Amino acid sequence: MARAAPPALLLPLLGLAAATAAAAAAAAAVGCPSSTWVQFQDSCYIFLQEAIKVESIEDVRNQCTDHGADMVSIHNEEENTFILETLKKQWKGPDDILLGMFFDTDDASFKWFDKSNMTFDKWSDQEDGEDLVDTCAFLHTKTGEWKKGNCEVSSVEGTLCKAAIPYEKKYLSDNHILISALVIASTVILTVLGAVIWFLYKRNLDSGFTTVFSTAPQSPFNDDCVLVVAEENEYAVQFD
């Protein structure tokens, strides 16, 4: 007698297990585009170490936009320190890094190329009344201070780029621990539930086979009865 197929309930369980595994993979994949980027708070940073010849700061900026980013902007002391330490320890950058900043003559103020608000500065050479037309900013990696310089640079020894983590990715990343815990718990529950259902299914199946054998026709004579009858028949033949 062929055994029946596993109960249909196991198929949805397998589907749920596959879905939770896919959710775990998606949660693990969030963050920066690749391992060459470094994440800090809600942004990803990459230092393009190639030295290039340029005619203007726009050529430098294109290096970043080609990677889906923009030239770096800095908004607090913690971010400035992070960039400084990473340049020293990991990126091995030059003494001066061009920041993504320009002087807007329309309202006589410095602005970031990525259009974020100018909420922080660390100027080392702030002077009143200086001519700031075509002025850009550089981060001095030895001190962490900013200094002004001409935007019409002829070459750069590396470009520091920054990209914001999309809202969806940031939300998933912030809740990665919770998601992982839920995935693990769901997987354990599904595994235990599947094992219980499979055990009950096999037990019921084995009980069915036992019932079939127990209801099969039985001979009215057992082996001992057959042996006694045979001996009596043999004894009767000897006296005939």
Swiss-Prot record:
The gene is CD302. It is found in: Membrane; Cell projection, Filopodium; Cytoplasm, Cell cortex. The keyword Lipid metabolism does not apply. GO terms for molecular function: carbohydrate binding; signaling receptor activity. Glycans are attached at N117. The chain crosses the membrane at residues 177-197. Residues 40-160 form the C-type lectin domain. Potential multifunctional C-type lectin receptor that may play roles in endocytosis and phagocytosis as well as in cell adhesion and migration. One of its GO terms (cellular component) is filopodium. Disulfide bonds join C136-C151. Keywords: Cell projection, Cytoplasm, Disulfide bond, Glycoprotein, Lectin, Membrane, Receptor, Signal, Transmembrane, Transmembrane helix. The keyword Transmembrane helix applies. It is a single-pass type I membrane protein. The lineage of its organism: Eukaryota, Metazoa, Chordata, Craniata, Vertebrata. This is CD302 antigen. Residues 198-240 are cytoplasmic.
